[in-house]
Each structure stands twice: as C-alpha cells, then as structure tokens.
C-alpha cells in the first residue's frame, strides 16, 4: 500500500483477519478503524472526528466493531452504520487517572467486556450496562505485588473465544491472562 497520503497507515496497532477474508485495522495515529480487502481497498471505516489514538479494534459476532479510543479513555461499540451503540469511559471514577490510555478490549462469550486500562494500572471486566464486575489491580496505583499491575497492555480470559485463540473442547474459563507494556 501507499507510504503516505489518506490511504497510508500511521502506526497500525492491531489487525484482525475477518471471516470474509478482509482485515480490520486499528490505525492508531490516523485516529480510525478500517476494514480493508486483501488488495488494500477500504470497504468500511470509522473515523469520527472525536477519535484520538485508536489503539485496538475487533469485529464482534453481530458485525458491530469494538474500538478502543485510547486518547479519550473510552471503549466504543460501533454498528456498521457508524452509530455508537455503547461506550464506556475508563476515567470515570474518583481514583482514575484523568488520561488512563486503555489499550485493549475484548468482548467475552458471556457478553461482558474485558479491558486493559493501561495507566489506571488495572484490568477490568464490565457488563453490558457498564458496571464493573471484576477488577485486578488497584486503580491508578502501580506495583508488582498481589493485586498490583504496571501498565497492563493486553488482557483476555483464557478459554473464552474472543477471536484470538479458540478454546480447547469442554474448557471452562477460569483464569485471566495479562501482559504488560
């Protein structure tokens, strides 16, 4: 593809191969999520002027797209008509860092969403209403001891098929996997 201009990527931070053989890309510094064909034609994009630093994008089973708008500390779910159908701000509690730069989110099989909330030093799982149902790490307090994290970058539940790794047969998800930056 091109190396400069409107069709060039600027720090693509994630890429997901879709069932239709297209690729969904979080084009971080162009502030957009795009779906491209194998010959680099853009067939869908979300580039609302309100986006700032798109860190991650993932297509959901219902064809909506989960987007991490890191610069605005939010997780968005966008339908194919580019309507926001859900959003969650990771800087909305009193102890939150004002700019926590969430870096990754994945929709779990049970409908909840796991979020690596990088500078808030935590991984959270939220339900469909935005309620936190699980948290590991102390909000905005880095560390290396029990219940402490230092800039978690990625998180997913082992055995929960989120498009990253299919679970083994008859596996019950019981553990949370974390990786730091």
Language model feature labels by segment:
Residues 1-181:
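Histidine-/acidic-rich catalytic cores in large beta-rich domains
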């Amino acid at each position: 593809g091109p190396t400069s201009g409107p069709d060039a990527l600027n720090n693509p931070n994630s890429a997901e191969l879709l069932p239709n053989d297209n690729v969904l890309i979080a084009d971080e510094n162009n502030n957009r999520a795009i779906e491209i064909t194998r010959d680099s034609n853009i067939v869908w994009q979300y580039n609302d002027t309100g986006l700032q630093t798109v860190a991650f994008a993932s297509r959901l089973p219902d064809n909506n797209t989960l987007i991490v708008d890191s610069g605005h500390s939010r997780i968005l779910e966008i339908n194919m008509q580019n309507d926001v159908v859900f959003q969650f701000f990771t800087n909305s509690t009193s102890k939150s860092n004002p700019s926590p730069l969430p870096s990754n989110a994945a929709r779990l099989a049970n409908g909840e969403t796991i979020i690596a909330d990088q500078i808030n030093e935590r991984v959270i799982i939220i339900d469909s209403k935005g309620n936190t149902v699980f948290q590991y790490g102390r909000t905005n307090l880095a560390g290396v001891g029990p219940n402490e994290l230092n800039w978690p970058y990625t998180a997913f539940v082992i055995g929960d098929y989120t498009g990253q790794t299919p679970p083994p047969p008859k596996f019950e998800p019981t553990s949370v996997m974390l990786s730091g930056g």
